[in-house]
């Protein structure tokens, strides 16, 4: 029996070392050399180097002076991130959307963009379409006492246009840039 067990244990040990130690160390080393920012979580830092968040995970911003992220079904908690799984016919979904739209509605701005009242699949999408960010510009400019044009220019300068897919604005990066604006 030991004759059969020995090769199995040796295989287990070798494969455990290769797949559990060598391969992860190799991939981590390559990632740190080739993509250090992404390998470390795409962290955003303030002027003093303090980590404020990740470009990859949405944060909740309350108050009129901030651009708001998409609603989150899991209250922006990474542990419980998920979609709401409410069917379009569910009255609870219609009530939540109506409530969120009423909170986001700005007079004379037209209908609230869909991205500001619907949750994403993960509940943690950090980006908004540029239209949703521009929709909030008047509220943010008024609350901060800034010229509307300055805030609109900030949205435009933070609009990312990937090679594939629609243009997006990272809400955390945009709000970080807002803190640097002077009245």
Swiss-Prot record:
Alphabetically ordered keywords of this record: ATP-binding, Cell inner membrane, Cell membrane, Ion transport, Membrane, Nucleotide-binding, Potassium, Potassium transport, Transmembrane, Transmembrane helix, Transport
Record has Transmembrane as a keyword: yes
Membrane topology qualifier: Single-pass membrane protein
InterPro entries (alphabetical): KdpC
Disulphide bridges, residue numbers: none
Record has Plastid as a keyword: no
GO cellular component: plasma membrane
Localization per record: Cell inner membrane
GO MF assignments: ATP binding; P-type potassium transmembrane transporter activity
Transmembrane segments: 10-30
Family label: Belongs to the KdpC family.
Subunit structure: The system is composed of three essential subunits: KdpA, KdpB and KdpC.
Functional summary from the UniProt entry: Part of the high-affinity ATP-driven potassium transport (or Kdp) system, which catalyzes the hydrolysis of ATP coupled with the electrogenic transport of potassium into the cytoplasm. This subunit acts as a catalytic chaperone that increases the ATP-binding affinity of the ATP-hydrolyzing subunit KdpB by the formation of a transient KdpB/KdpC/ATP ternary complex.
The name this protein goes by in its record: Potassium-transporting ATPase KdpC subunit
Organism of origin: Pseudomonas aeruginosa (strain UCBPP-PA14)
């Amino acid at each position: 029996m030991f004759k059969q067990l020995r090769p199995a244990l040796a295989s287990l040990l070798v494969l455990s070392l290769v797949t559990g130690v060598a391969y992860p160390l190799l991939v981590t080393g390559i990632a740190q050399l080739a993509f250090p920012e992404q390998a470390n979580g795409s962290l955003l830092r303030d002027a003093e180097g303090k980590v404020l968040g990740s470009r990859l995970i949405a944060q909740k911003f309350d108050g009129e002076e901030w651009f708001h992220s998409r609603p989150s079904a899991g209250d922006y908690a990474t542990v419980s991130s998920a979609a709401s799984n409410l069917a379009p016919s569910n009255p609870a979904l219609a009530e939540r959307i109506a409530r969120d739209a009423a909170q986001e509605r700005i007079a004379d701005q037209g209908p609230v963009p869909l991205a500001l009242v619907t949750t994403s699949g993960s509940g943690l999408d950090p980006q908004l379409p540029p239209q949703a960010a521009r929709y909030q510009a008047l509220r943010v400019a008024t609350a901060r006492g800034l010229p509307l044009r300055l805030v609109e220019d900030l949205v435009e300068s933070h609009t990312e246009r990937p090679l594939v897919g629609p243009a997006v604005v990272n809400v955390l990066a945009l709000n970080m840039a807002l803190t640097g604006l002077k009245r």
